[in-house]
């Protein structure tokens, strides 16, 4: 399958959309018809996409109850929130600003 429980997200300065899964469920956990992979990631949807896109998680942004993501256009840093009562604010520093799939540091 693709992604589940996509909550909020955010537009990037380069025009793509970040979508956030707000459920870190995985195989062995019941969700609909069952799961075959881990969830709880952020995904980037390319601005130029004209059809379905193969979902590839931005693993370096962590796996948790993601709520939203916002990119600072001056630094390229991504600020992430969680959808939990005891949540925190995260900052992701990309290895290459504007190329989130290249990894970075949370």
Where are these regions (language model features)?
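Conserved small-residue
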Residues: 1-106
